[in-house]
Design a protein with these regions (language model features):
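Short, charged/polar low-complexity linear motifs in solvent-exposed/disordered segments
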Residues: 65-66, 87
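SF2 helicase/translocase NTPase motor core
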Residues: 23-37, 41, 71-73, 82-148
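ATP-dependent helicase/translocase motor core
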Residues: 1-65, 72-81, 148
Length: 148
């Protein structure tokens, strides 16, 4: 006969109690995500592939051709990471940051792209070459970031 500690019994009871109440990522995507319904099927497949690769290898790159919706797949990933309370850092070319990413984040994911409190930081890739306080700032950001 196996002996269980009171903690083991308590944790098992809680796990059983909340087993059907815990929302999986797929349920969230289908029912609550802002971005998921906007994606075309091939973009959803790209998103799922990225998540699968990132979980397996600790990271992934989205390298699709022009016009295939990398921005929207990226927004979906940012939304999911925000839901998971991850600290996300996004680097984009300056023109894409100002002309695409900042406006799309404000439009589609305003709760994640806050100015006062946010787990999302967006930079131009040229910021990486800046001097002064920037190298130390990026060092701190790299220590805090869960996703870059």
């Amino acid at each position: 006969m196996e002996t269980w500690s009171p903690f083991d019994i308590y944790s098992h009871a809680l796990r059983e109690l909340f087993r059907d109440r815990e929302e999986s990522a797929n349920v969230w995507e289908e029912n609550e995500s802002i971005m998921f319904p906007i994606l075309d099927q091939y973009q959803k497949e790209a998103y799922w592939s990225l998540v699968k690769i990132a979980n397996r290898f600790g990271g992934a790159f989205l390298c699709d051709g022009v016009g295939l919706g990398k921005t929207f797949v990226g927004l979906m990933l940012v939304e999911r990471m925000g839901r998971e309370k991850k600290h996300v850092v996004l680097f984009a070319p300056k023109g894409a940051k100002e002309g695409v990413w900042d406006p799309k984040l404000r439009e589609l994911l305003p709760d994640l792209f806050g100015t006062d409190f946010s787990n999302l930081a967006v930079f131009s890739h040229t910021d990486l070459n800046r001097e002064g306080e920037w190298p130390e700032r990026f060092k701190r950001i790299a220590e805090i970031a869960d996703v870059i």
